[in-house]
């Protein structure tokens, strides 16, 4: 799937949010953390990821376009908090007490681990499989592993091997 183009006005709003939150953090923490690089190449159902060693934030362009205000207000500071926590505390739990403190006390944003965006447009195709108690939907990746003989999957409820439906 081709990555959608983000209009310049939205890119500017994302950058403004990033810079405002970073400036607040630098002021409150009395530090001068460098501005991270923004990349609009996150795919799948993740809204964003923070690449700690690269000081980079990857954002999902599809979810950004569909949820502009909430995305800018929540996802941008969420990923920035991961980078700041790593630089301030070192390696700690991704959504642990340090991250929660950074989100709420430093950035002034509610600490939510996951987004609540509609995912229909980014959810990948699934393949129906069956056990004796229910139907399951396997992702393309898992389905291909089954087809190649690299993996088998069992139902967590009944323990049966999952079999592709015809």
From Swiss-Prot:
Localization per Swiss-Prot or TrEMBL: Cytoplasm
GO terms (BP aspect): response to stress
GO molecular function annotations of the record: zinc ion binding
Q: Where this protein primarily resides, as one coarse class?
A: cytoplasm
Q: How is the cofactor bound?
A: Binds 1 zinc ion.
Q: Which GO terms describe its cellular component?
A: cytoplasm
The identity of this protein, by name, is Protein SprT
Query: Which PROSITE patterns does the entry link to?
Result: ZINC_PROTEASE (PS00142)
Species in which this protein is naturally found: Klebsiella pneumoniae subsp. pneumoniae (strain ATCC 700721 / MGH 78578)
Pfam families given for it? SprT-like (PF10263), Zn_ribbon_SprT (PF17283)
The cofactors required by this protein are: Zn(2+)
* Signal peptide range: none
Record's HAMAP family? SprT
- Name the residues that bind Zn(2+): 78, 82
Catalytic residues, chain numbering? 79
Superkingdom to which the source organism belongs = Bacteria
